[in-house]
Amino acid sequence: MDSSRSSNSLDSGSSLTLGELACAALIPVLALVDAVVFAAAQCFQKRPPGLLPATLAARARRRAGGRLTFRELADLADESRCFSVNEVEALYELYKKISCSIVDDGLIHKEELQLALFRTPAGKNLFLDRVFDLFDEKKNSVIEFEEFIHAISVFHPNTPLEDKIDFSFRLYDLRQTGFIEREEVKQMVVATLLESEVQLSDDLVEAILDKTFEDADTDKDNRISKEEWKAFVLKHPSVIKKMTLPTLKDTTAAFPSFIFNTQVED
């Protein structure tokens, strides 16, 4: 992208430019979610004939050392508000693959998430830090399976817009103050440009930030509250257009008749 093209985008409304940058920031995690969908489909397609899901769940618990029961799977499906019990079980298969890639303890460590996203376990990455922090709801430096399900479900087409807006807000709220500050947005924009190998002049980046805060910071206190962010996103939906992956809904629709007839104990 050259400066003249970017300047034209800015002249026509920098919210579109910011939206493109925000979408670019989500590309690595979108790739992971796409991998989740593909792996889930493969889990269903390769299921041995006549093998009950109860048997598969028991195998999974033995291999991972976990104790997921049918009730736990059902509860996670209910919490997600979009995945079926069968899909949660399939996602558990993928979760285990990621969680044993470096440390085989049934939990996803930051290095394992980095390996899944960027094919390397080393190196500093602001985007990785933010994604890991958002996935790690308990703030115990690992991603547990229920946290994994919660994060993936945000991208489902049936997930309420409010949840998607909240996720995107927290992505930019680097210091977790409950507000998006200019420097935080700048850090994310610069990190996104570096990852995308897109070059923009410092003046153009500042102009994008100026326009964004002019539109979003309605009370002019040099920071964007959650309410202001919601209003901004509703006005400029391109900012979170990549927060919905139709393939997640396709996965749900692809297996509507698969009955989870399990005999695992509650």
Swiss-Prot record:
Q: Which Pfam families does the entry mention?
A: EF-hand_7
| Keyword Metal-binding part of the UniProt annotation | yes
Keywords for this protein:
Calcium, Metal-binding, Repeat
Taxonomically, the superkingdom here is Eukaryota
Tissue specificity is: Expressed in shoots, culms, leaves and young spikelets.
The UniProt family comment states: Belongs to the calcineurin regulatory subunit family.
Q: How does it assemble?
A: Homodimer.
Function according to Swiss-Prot or TrEMBL: Acts as a calcium sensor. CBL proteins interact with CIPK serine-threonine protein kinases. Binding of a CBL protein to the regulatory NAF domain of a CIPK protein lead to the activation of the kinase in a calcium-dependent manner.
Q: What is this protein called?
A: Calcineurin B-like protein 10
